[in-house]
Amino acid sequence: MSDDKRAKPEKSKYPVNLLDTPFPMRGDLPKREPQWVKQWQDKQLYKKIRAARHGAKKFVLHDGPPYANGDIHIGHAVNKVLKDMIIKARGLTGLDAVYVPGWDCHGMPIEIQIEKQFGKGLPVQEVQSKARAYATEQIARQRKDFERLGVLGDWENPYLTMNFSNEADELRALGKIMERGYVFRGLKPVNWCFDCGSALAEAEVEYKDKVDLSIDVGFPFAETDKIAHAFHVPLAQLEGKPGWIVIWTTTPWTIPSNQALNMHPEVEYALVDTPRGFLILAKDRVEEQLKTYALEGTIVATARGDALTEVRFHHPLAKMDAGYVRTSPVYLGDYVTTDTGTGIVHSAPAYGVEDFQSCKAHGMPDSDIISPVMGDGVYASTLPLFGGLSIWDANPKIVEVLRESGNLFNSHKYEHSYMHCWRHKTPIIYRATSQWFAGMDVDPVDNGPTLRETALAGIEATEFYPAWGKQRLHNMIANRPDWTLSRQRQWGVPMAFFVHKETGALHPRTPELLEEVAKLVEKHGIEAWQTLDPKDLLGDEAAQYEKNRDTLDVWFDSGTTHWTVIRGSHRDELYDPAADLPDGRLADLYLEGSDQHRGWFHSSLLTASMLYGKPPYKALLTHGFTVDGEGRKMSKSVGNTVSPQDISNKMGAEIIRLWVASTDYSGELSISDEILKRVVEGYRRIRNTLRFLLANLTDYDHAKHALPASEWLEIDRYAVALTDRLQKEVLSHYQAYEFHPVVAKLQTFCSEDLGGFYLDVLKDRLYTTAADSKARRGAQNALYHITQAMLHWMAPFLTFTAEEAWQIFAHGTEHKDTIFTSTYYAIPSVDDGDTLLQKWHEIRTVRAEVTRQLEAVRVEGDIGSSLQAEVTIAAGGPVLAALQSLEDDLRFVLLTSAAKVTPAPEGGDLLVTVTPSQHAKCERCWHYRADVGHNPEHPTICGRCDSNLFGAGEHRSHA
């Protein structure tokens, strides 16, 4: 270890062993980290690690791909650093911990960028070409930032969902799930964004407050006789006055599409006589609603909802235009509530999931469903009264027309939580369109369990970190609708079907044709579908079929990467045949933010359940979102965002890594300037400890100077036993993917166990005993083992610093290039370790009390440093025995010039007496001793220093 070390030039007549190290006190991280990243790239560090682990058991953390658009933000940094720490921690156990980074490349955000740059209306092929080029540029930018964070991985060969092979294999996955009977086409209300012009996945929907017009609308009685019968009142009583069943809604724009009314079968409904006419309302809502309508009223009769089933009412706009002359029947629904509104729900099956299900359950054919809202949010021109208006602009006009009709009972502004597109931040609607779905509850062709059943069983077989994620994902799968696979976009993997022009049926050879298209895509990308002439595959049948123009949901892109990447493009690196065993999984771990329970975790579970009948992962790990120091969500408008690039340039990426590691990622991760300042202070403590260790190992060569543990001094054996105990805790935390306890314990170890005790005691022996004495070499043995262990503990999160120190520490050894080809250090066993841990715990407790008493005397001005003092300790029991066993070495433990132990009176407490020393100070060791000047040739040093410099050297037994 001494090849590139240097000792400070000694000027003193009585030198001490003060050594230097190339490991600087200041990390200078912003300047030096980029140099290290370049070195790692130049020497292909990741490949060296893979070569070192060749043949070892694999550990696969499959990367959830970030989207290839824009610079990385602090959330990206958290995610990538967490993954990197886990990969490195697992790799240091000897596993072949592979990391292939990936990117999600298709989809709407990139299409939007192409529109912004080049305008709308480009040919599809040109959009795809420009989108591919744009994504490539974005990936290069993001990759540079990820590598800057010290993240090691196969950056030269990442997976991209837009790679031709991945696009082709995605089509093959679609073919497989079709063959197994999960895919169908149908008319259903789906989340629809007018700005996207496309259906949205559940994961693409967010909720924000929105102010809408809330209206109470009356549907006039159409079958008065049936109403009289249901409420058991004479028909004549109802015939003299008008009557309405009243609904409440916050979506006036759906009224033109009303086709039914929903009532709860078991709720009591009231027939209320008012000056305006008869009203039907839920009995529990009568008082509240009449106040709202400014009406007095009397309940004439009541009836349960099921008594009114199939009774019909006139459409409220029938008087205003003949196009609305129709009636709406009452259908029963358990989902109707009486918490708010009237207890009656108006049903527009084209624009509500429950509305649609209710109408379909009552036999309404798809062709009868009224759906006037077009994909851009504008009513079809053929819609009476409101054609050509956007639905949002139509709302106030609809209210006005209802008022004119005499059927409006109330309208007011109403704030509520409403669905928005996560990209455009604009309101979305449910809209019935013809789409391709993966059925959650359809029977697969093998008559096995449904997709929902398979996925729920898979959740039970998955580990969750933290544990609450299990119930969250379970609830989402248990309650989700069918998965809308199709999108009406251009930059996406095509649903490459041939559809019969007249019947709409798929070509009978669809699985075979999908494989043919996949082969073309493998060579030319998804662009091949655009240029494909159906005749090339269908021959004479081409005239009867047309190409489907839908693309696959981008969540299907990333959700099938276990198929397209682990089994496909990166099979050699990632695939383990054991994954195909009944309990096998393709990945050990998926790790993402908590939003991915409804995103990537979710889509990956569904696709794997359809393809293999089990999850793709053994475990799911979830981290929280970043917030500022006050717990507020990061927002550009608030101005509280924190840029990882800025932190790296000002403080160093190591500080980001340490912040991530020191934060409990299972909750929100707070970050601010003040928090980062504390992280920097913690980093300096660790770095200073490392510097001390490395400096005092400068002249140590383990091959020459190693000693068996039995020949070390007692305090050295204690320190190594303490290190061994901590290592067991550290490795246990790493196994459970816990980092913040490791950081906390490492910092405590550095500041209290080492800096506050062991190294403090050790300085005298390291500096003053003979350089090659057993006392000093024994101390260096302990320091060597502690440093080995410590560097491995910190390497997963303090990667730059651990590697920097390792280059100095491991110079000339087998793993000199990188700490990451080695494994966690096997700390030598200390036979009496448990006994020493207990004994020295008691000694340290006494030392803390002595230090407190010394400080009190120092504050009084009676002493300067603790070496100016002599102490007498009165103690009893095991404490007395422990202190007495140290003999004269006790003074070195207490950092005093003399220490004496006496038995305490029976039952007496520990008593510490501090006395200023009356002796002279040794120029060399600074102890105040009676024998200073005993050798006239060296009148300024003590007998111990005289012996260490010119004689046989002092004897140490314990410390």
From Swiss-Prot:
Give the note describing cofactor binding and stoichiometry: Binds 1 zinc ion per subunit.
User: Enzyme group, top EC level?
Assistant: ligase
Q: What molecular functions are annotated in GO for this chain?
A: aminoacyl-tRNA deacylase activity; ATP binding; isoleucine-tRNA ligase activity; tRNA binding; zinc ion binding
- Keyword Transmembrane helix on this protein? no
Binding of L-isoleucyl-5'-AMP occurs at 592
Where do the annotations place Zn(2+) binding? 922, 925, 942, 945
Chain positions of motif 'KMSKS' region:
633-637
Record field: catalytic activity: tRNA(Ile) + L-isoleucine + ATP = L-isoleucyl-tRNA(Ile) + AMP + diphosphate
Give the main localization category: cytoplasm
Instruction: Detail which positions bind ATP.
Output: 636
Record bears the keyword Glycosyltransferase? no
- Please provide the record's keywords in A-Z order: Aminoacyl-tRNA synthetase, ATP-binding, Cytoplasm, Ligase, Metal-binding, Nucleotide-binding, Protein biosynthesis, Zinc
For this protein, the record's PROSITE patterns field holds: AA_TRNA_LIGASE_I (PS00178)
Identify one Gene Ontology CC term for this UniProt entry: cytosol
**Assembly and binders:** Monomer.
The similarity annotation says:
Belongs to the class-I aminoacyl-tRNA synthetase family. IleS type 1 subfamily.
What is the name listed in the Swiss-Prot or TrEMBL entry for this protein? Isoleucine--tRNA ligase
Organism of derivation: Cupriavidus metallidurans (strain ATCC 43123 / DSM 2839 / NBRC 102507 / CH34)
Gene name, please?
Answer: ileS
